[in-house]
From Swiss-Prot:
Full protein name: Sulfite reductase [NADPH] flavoprotein alpha-component
Entry GO MF terms: flavin adenine dinucleotide binding; FMN binding; oxidoreductase activity; sulfite reductase (NADPH) activity
Cross-referenced InterPro entries: CysJ, CysJ-like_FAD-binding, CysJ_Proteobact, FAD-bd_FR_type, Flavdoxin-like, Flavodoxin/NO_synth, Flavoprot_Pyr_Nucl_cyt_Rdtase, Flavoprotein-like_sf
Gene name of this polypeptide: cysJ1
Family: Belongs to the NADPH-dependent sulphite reductase flavoprotein subunit CysJ family. In the N-terminal section; belongs to the flavodoxin family.
Organism: Neisseria meningitidis serogroup B (strain ATCC BAA-335 / MC58)
Length: 604
């Protein structure tokens, strides 16, 4: 409602009679307080007496409201934030919720109560949609937040060194800028449901109590905010995956390649599952039976020993196969195991966090048992393990092209540790143990932060290395199916042209058909001097800048630890060199692209 509308809602009030004015002038503070309450109550019933309601006569107290923000790579943070917001609204609290990609960072200065749920990507970095706020809070123009109360829930994976680092960074910076915690930060691991539910329950109880103390009547928000969509995937989800059939498993790297990359095709017929280019497919898997046997043999545990898992009793061999994480080590496992395996060397490892992190990254769980033998019961061992979690793979097909199928591009994890061959959990399941027509449990994980432009006439630049090319196959398939006018440019890198050119014939056909307008390939090991995608970006600086001036959207997919950082540095060099901006101006330009959703990353 405009100011003009507010002024004309009711007829003007007549002036008070002189005798009333004289009487009021003699009231003390206590009498004024009583009279204001009496008048307000009467005003609430004024309309029934034919009197105008005093809608603007008294200043309204500030409503008790909470802002709930989420920053997510795959959607988990958003789902938790939405649940927290729903809980608060059910308690009668006014809630404003948003994903950080849709939130104006400068608005943070005006917030009074804030809940933030954030994941972490790469080497402890915030998700791409949180970068603008992260930079603001850590920059020279960071606002004072002394009027803000906040709580942070971090989502992460404790097998990585910088566990929940983005949540830790936001939590610390809020406090440094003067904000006060509503609750201590919670760092939730892959199996985050219990931690997230407890955090949501605690914050809802606390804020409900605070709202009751507040004189303003909470105004529940009953209409979902704009942009909030119902998941299109029907009843199949992470908790209830669809039992799909494997259609194809084809190795697409050459026999001589050091990489084993598979093109996987899965049948979704009958599932009513829908996905968009940029989405991921969640894959549930069983651990390798040989790995389960090796672990039980090392511990001296009878495979038939009954334990409780998944809410029911079952043999420990079955539990380890289907319910517990065996291929990703964690600091928590090593510390817990050290309490049973009394070795001075192991004690030294857990005493130094940097050494522990390096040990975890390079030593599988089974090889911890080999190196430091110990005797544990089945119950003692499983208490050290995390629940098994699905793996997410970027979808490499467009449903407009393949219908009820979904395609994946899977890099199979294979390595040796102290002479023993090891294989990744999900990638080994898909490549080695899942037979054609065999069943694999899947679900669609939306990724709204990695989407083609709504305007299909806009040009796109796709930058990826290795299996990071997967979503770009889906992008170009989609544009070809739509006969889109927008130009497509692929910048792709891998070690060798002859061994590692993923989907070579398809890219050639797309180019021939007019749907791949420009392409640059970086083969890092085909010459003495290594060439990477970032080198191609710098080499094509003028052309890339021209595409940006034409409104191009840039997409980056691949390794977060090295490749994504090097690509961003190269993009900044392009903006500085071809765009004639200084370093600060280039950073601001890249931030502008982020805010306009013209610079999107899917890194892991």
């Amino acid at each position: 409602m405009s100011e003009h509308d507010m002024q004309n809602t009711n007829p003007p009030l007549p002036p008070l009679p002189p005798e009333i004015t004289q009487l009021l002038s003699g009231l003390d503070a206590a009498q004024w307080a009583w009279l204001s309450g009496y008048a307000w109550a009467k005003a609430g019933n004024g309309a029934s007496a034919g009197l105008p309601a005093l809608q603007t006569a008294l200043p309204a107290a500030e409503p008790f409201s909470v802002t709930v923000l989420s920053a997510s790579q795959t959607g988990n943070a958003k789902s938790v934030a939405d649940k927290a917001a729903d809980s608060l609204e059910a308690a009668g609290i006014q809630v404003s919720r948003a994903e950080l990609k849709d939130y104006k960072a400068k608005n943070i200065a005006g917030e009074r109560r804030l809940l933030l749920v954030t994941s972490t990507q790469g080497e402890g970095e915030p998700p791409k949609e949180a970068v603008v706020l992260h930079k603001l809070l850590n920059g020279k123009k960071a606002p004072k937040l002394d009027k803000l109360q906040f709580a942070v829930l971090g989502l992460g994976d404790s097998s990585y060194p910088n566990f929940c680092q983005a949540g830790k960074d936001f939590d610390r910076r809020f406090e440094e800028l003067g904000a006060k915690r509503l609750l201590e930060r919670v760092d939730a691991d892959l199996d985050f449901t219990a931690s997230a539910n407890a955090w949501t329950d605690n914050i809802a109880a606390l804020l409900k109590e605070e709202a009751a103390k507040n004189r303003a009547t909470p105004a529940p928000q009953t209409t979902p905010p704009a942009g909030l969509q119902t998941a299109p995937d029907g009843r199949y989800c992470k908790a209830a995956p669809f039992p799909a059939a494997l259609l194809a498993n084809q190795k697409i790297t050459a026999r001589q390649s050091d990489k084993d990359v598979r093109h996987i095709e899965i049948d979704l017929s009958g599932s009513d599952l829908h996905y968009l280019p940029g989405d991921a497919l969640g894959v549930w898997f069983d651990n390798d039976p040989a790995l389960v046997r090796e672990i039980l043999d090392l511990l001296g545990i009878d495979p038939a020993t009954e334990i409780q898992a998944g809410g029911k009793m079952m043999p420990v061999a079955r539990a380890l196969s289907s319910h517990f994480e065996l291929t990703q080590n964690t600091p928590a496992f090593v510390k817990g195991y050290a309490a049973f395996a009394h070795y001075e060397e192991l004690d030294k490892i857990i005493a130094d966090n940097a050494v522990l992190q390096d040990f975890v990254q390079n030593t599988p769980i089974v090889d911890v048992l080999h190196r430091f033998p110990a005797s544990l019961t089945a119950e003692q061992f499983i208490r050290l393990l995390r629940p098994l979690a699905p793996r997410l793979y970027s979808i490499s097909s467009a449903q407009a092209e393949v219908g009820d199928e979904v395609h994946l591009t899977v890099g199979v994890v294979r390595f040796e540790h102290e002479g023993r061959a090891r294989t990744g959990g999900a990638s080994g399941f898909l490549a080695d143990r899942l037979e054609e027509d065999g069943t694999v449990r899947v679900f669609v994980e939306r990724n709204d932060g990695f989407r083609l432009p709504e305007d299909s006439r806009k040009p796109i630049v796709m930058i990826g290395s290795g299996t990071g090319v997967a979503p770009f196959r889906a992008f170009v398939q989609q544009r070809a199916a739509e006969n889109a006018e927008g130009k497509n440019w692929l910048i792709f890198g891998n070690p060798h042209f002859a061994r590692d050119f993923l989907y070579q014939t398809e890219w050639q056909q797309f180019a021939k058909d007019g749907f791949l307008h420009r392409y640059d390939f970086a083969w890092s090991r085909d010459q003495e001097e290594k060439i990477y995608v970032q080198d191609k970006i710098r080499e094509q600086a003028e052309g890339l800048w021209q595409w940006l001036q034409e409104g191009a959207h840039i997409y980056v997919c691949g390794d977060a630890a090295k490749m994504a950082k090097d690509v961003e540095a190269a993009l900044l060099d392009v903006i500085i060199g071809a765009g004639h901006l200084d370093e600060e101006g280039a950073e601001e330009y890249l931030d502008m692209l982020r805010e306009e959703k013209r610079y999107q990353r899917d890194v892991y």
